[in-house]
């Protein structure tokens, strides 16, 4: 008997499911798209235990004819296309005929559907792809699909899934994305018996965006539109003062389909040019209509990606769409806007977006001491950063970890690089990354030992968020309190920061907390990972900057503290803090050896 064997249909379907069905959120996506193709105007999504125990999608679409129930659960059976020419002009969400069969092959699935032509509806079941006979049930119009025990027959797949909370968030994100594409459809989402949101139909996309992301978006959205070269685009982008520190606020649709476009975030950054800081990413909700023959949606089994016939042409159109509105909506030049962005922000605790974490652009340390006065017992302490770590404490706890033992310094080059001599050579030290390493290790040590106090804010800080974001943050309330961040709900779409850890200096807490929330958004983090992220946020925001004027005592203190760091050669993000030239290096350079 030969070694090459034909695979069974069941195994073929399970392999196909691995490409199409990543987890419960993939099931939700595929079934909602079927509802859209069936002209549904109402879609209900229910999940239990992150969708692994139960998923139910109910719609009021056109329904499935009785004779089509069984074929609908078979692989490569579809009503969307008939030949290759149809594939070249596909406008429906689904067309591959894989989704239902893939879902059925890894779950216990019940399919109920009725049409307006039928007085009764019909039901069929599938267990791991094995379809039972259909049966007649009381009539209704639409389709109900119940998916139970997802991946029950592929336990390895379950092992790779994240926590229930993480899977719940992915489902919410999927429904959110689909709801953005179809404001003319009412969506309801329930998770573990709790109503997450009800989205009524809307007349325009802006109202749907506000429903999902919060009222604070209303005054920060710029409408965009452009038509040329066979492409039509509409949508909204955020103004330059409203942005995130990650790309999760960017939604792009091609012919109604949510798509991941290669380099889209790069194009957005290029379009905004100088209007955003390096770590700022704008929101965008963009909807493109393109002749289907000019795009290939059959690139990925899950239909996440798309290929353009003229990619360069599309990229040029994309840039023009964004830049046109930014220029027309801004009465001053890009250069003037850049100057405005670099002005210090007013000292106020006014409302700010959850994702808006802009630095004032001016380092408050300029023109004043970075360290407090000298104490022979405790050494210098960092100014504006709360209590630092004394040199006596460092000496008691550990020894120096490298041969970097500074003897004297010679000043600063280009207002950035400290020049110093040590036992083993000549060093050039980046003042920012060096101080960042110092602050990172100090804060991390305090967190690990829980050696810090909590201080209330005289004026609590309000942070506007969407309902979903508020729920996500409050679900992690206890985790955030482990690093000294105390957040409470304020209404339905805000949170309030009332207390902060003493390792933060008042005046920086807003930027640090917003940065921390952004870095932890949607991520499963252990306690050590939370400590690491918080220490990095504090270090990044509080470290002295390039161009800060440093006195001789401050320079000496930076070098001394750096020599006690566990890893003095790198900042927390991996950039070098110092470059060494040994005596041998110098002598070889001058041909003395």
Curated annotation (Swiss-Prot):
Superkingdom field: Bacteria
GO biological process: mismatch repair
Key words, A-Z: DNA damage, DNA repair
Any Gene Ontology CC annotation: mismatch repair complex
GO MF annotation: an example: ATP binding
SUPFAM superfamilies the UniProt entry points to: ATPase domain of HSP90 chaperone/DNA topoisomerase II/histidine kinase, DNA mismatch repair protein MutL, Ribosomal protein S5 domain 2-like
Pfam families: DNA_mis_repair (PF01119), HATPase_c_3 (PF13589), MutL_C (PF08676)
Gene3D superfamilies: 3.30.230.10, Histidine kinase-like ATPase, C-terminal domain (3.30.565.10), MutL, C-terminal domain, dimerisation subdomain (3.30.1540.20), MutL, C-terminal domain, regulatory subdomain (3.30.1370.100)
Function of the protein: This protein is involved in the repair of mismatches in DNA. It is required for dam-dependent methyl-directed DNA mismatch repair. May act as a 'molecular matchmaker', a protein that promotes the formation of a stable complex between two or more DNA-binding proteins in an ATP-dependent manner without itself being part of a final effector complex.
HAMAP family: DNA_mis_repair (MF_00149)
Family assignment from sequence similarity: Belongs to the DNA mismatch repair MutL/HexB family.
Name listed for the protein in its UniProt record: DNA mismatch repair protein MutL
Protein source organism: Leptospira interrogans serogroup Icterohaemorrhagiae serovar Lai (strain 56601)
Lineage, uppermost ranks: Bacteria, Pseudomonadati, Spirochaetota, Spirochaetia, Leptospirales
Gene: mutL
């Amino acid at each position: 008997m030969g070694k090459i064997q034909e695979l069974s249909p069941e195994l073929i379907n399970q392999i196909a499911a691995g490409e199409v069905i990543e987890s419960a959120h993939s099931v939700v996506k595929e079934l909602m798209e079927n509802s859209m193709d069936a002209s549904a105007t109402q879609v209900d999504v229910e999940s239990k235990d992150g969708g692994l125990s139960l998923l139910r999608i109910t719609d009021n679409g056109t329904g499935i004819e009785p004779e089509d129930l069984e074929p609908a659960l078979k692989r490569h059976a579809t009503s969307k296309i008939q030949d290759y020419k149809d594939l070249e002009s596909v406008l429906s969400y689904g067309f591959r005929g894989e989704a239902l069969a893939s879902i059925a092959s890894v779950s216990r699935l019940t399919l109920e559907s009725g049409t307006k032509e039928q007085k009764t509806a019909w039901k069929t079941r599938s267990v791991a792809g094995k379809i039972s006979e259909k049966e007649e049930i009381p009539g209704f119009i639409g389709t109900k699909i119940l998916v139970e025990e997802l991946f029950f027959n592929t336990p390895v797949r379950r092992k790779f899934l994240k926590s229930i909370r993480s899977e719940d968030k992915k489902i919410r994100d999927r429904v959110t994305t689909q709801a953005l594409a179809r404001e003319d459809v009412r969506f309801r989402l329930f998770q573990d018996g709790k109503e997450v949101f009800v989205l009524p139909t809307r007349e325009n996309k802006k109202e749907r965006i506000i429903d999902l992301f919060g009222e604070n978006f209303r005054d920060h959205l710029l409408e965009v539109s452009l038509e040329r070269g066979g492409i039509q685009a509409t949508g909204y982008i955020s103004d330059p003062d409203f942005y995130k520190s990650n790309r999760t606020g960017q939604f792009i649709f091609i012919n109604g389909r949510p798509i991941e476009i290669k380099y889209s975030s790069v194009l957005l950054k290029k379009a905004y040019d100088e209007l955003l800081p390096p770590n700022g990413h704008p929101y965008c909700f963009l909807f493109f209509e393109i002749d289907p023959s000019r795009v290939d949606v059959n690139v990925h089994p899950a239909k996440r990606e798309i290929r353009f016939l003229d990619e360069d042409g599309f990229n040029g159109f994309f840039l023009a769409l964004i830049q046109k509105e930014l220029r027309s909506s801004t009465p001053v030049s890009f250069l003037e806007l850049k100057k405005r962005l670099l002005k210090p922000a007013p000292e106020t605790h006014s409302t700010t977006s959850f994702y808006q974490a802009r630095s004032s652009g001016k380092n408050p340390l300029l023109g004043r001491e970075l360290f407090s006065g000298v104490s022979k017992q405790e050494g210098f302490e960092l100014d504006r950063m709360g209590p630092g770590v004394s040199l006596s404490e460092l000496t008691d706890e550990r020894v120096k970890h490298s041969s970097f033992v500074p003897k004297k310094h010679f000043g600063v080059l280009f207002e950035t690089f400290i020049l110093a001599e040590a036992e083993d050579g000549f060093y050039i030290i980046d003042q920012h990354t060096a101080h960042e390493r110092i602050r990172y290790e100090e804060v991390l040590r305090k967190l690990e030992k829980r050696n810090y106090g909590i201080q209330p804010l005289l004026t609590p800080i309000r942070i506007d968020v969407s309902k979903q974001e508020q729920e996500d943050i409050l679900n992690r309330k206890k985790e955030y309190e482990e690093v000294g961040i105390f957040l409470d709900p304020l209404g339905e779409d805000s949170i309030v920061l009332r207390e902060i850890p003493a390792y933060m200096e008042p005046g920086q807490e807003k930027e640090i907390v917003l940065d921390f929330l952004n870095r932890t958004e949607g991520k499963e983090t252990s306690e050590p990972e939370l400590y690491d992220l918080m220490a990095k946020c504090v270090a990044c925001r509080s470290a002295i900057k390039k161009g800060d004027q440093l006195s001789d005592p401050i320079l000496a203190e930076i070098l001394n503290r750096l020599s006690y760091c566990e890893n003095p050669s790198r900042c927390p993000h991996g950039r070098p803090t110092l470059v060494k030239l040994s005596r041998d290096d110098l002598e070889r350079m001058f041909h003395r050896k």
